[in-house]
């Protein structure tokens, strides 16, 4: 099994936070995207590709970036203008936030792991998780979260600038989270 900790469906893309396991990410994504395309095409009596480009992935070490990714992914529907606020997000069917908050059910998402990082009981954990997400909502875009996996895994912008000063060059995907 491939645990999913956070997800959000947006009209033109989606986000998943999954743990790699015995099955490579490429295989998981191929199965997911192909299966979805087949079902979608059948339901809408159409054929062809649904997605324009290959998926993008970044490597995430669990501490501390894991929780930042959970928050970023679950706030995506607000940033995309699909819901107005956190109260609406609590019941938004196309994001894992509603499952973590216990407002909607779904057995494919591992909410226990996420909640365990916020408290001993589900009630306490949900309260602290919601406060954490709200804090991210209030913060808006955060410059310290700029950059793809390379920047975070290399020790941040300071380390990257030092590497560049020494003449090192990297290929990376720059992204803004926040």
Report residues per predicted region.
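Short Pro-Cys-Gly-centered "Cys-loop" motif that presents a nucleophilic cysteine in a tight turn
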Residues: 1-11, 19-178
């Amino acid at each position: 099994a491939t645990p999913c900790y956070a997800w959000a469906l947006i009209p033109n893309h989606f986000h998943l936070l999954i743990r790699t396991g015995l099955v490579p990410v490429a295989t998981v994504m191929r199965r997911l995207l192909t299966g979805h395309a087949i079902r979608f095409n059948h339901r809408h009596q159409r054929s062809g590709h649904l997605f324009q480009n290959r998926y993008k992935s970044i490597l995430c070490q669990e501490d501390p970036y894991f929780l930042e990714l959970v928050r970023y992914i679950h706030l995506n529907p607000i940033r995309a203008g699909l819901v107005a606020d956190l109260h609406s997000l609590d019941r938004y069917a196309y994001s894992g936030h509603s499952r973590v908050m216990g407002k909607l059910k779904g057995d494919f998402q591992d909410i226990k792991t996420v909640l365990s990082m916020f408290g001993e009981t589900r009630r306490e954990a949900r309260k602290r998780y919601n406060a954490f997400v709200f804090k991210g909502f209030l913060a808006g875009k955060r410059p310290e979260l700029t950059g793809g996996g390379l920047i975070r895994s290399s020790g941040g912008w300071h380390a990257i600038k030092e590497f560049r000063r020494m003449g090192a060059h990297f290929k990376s995907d720059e992204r803004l989270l926040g």
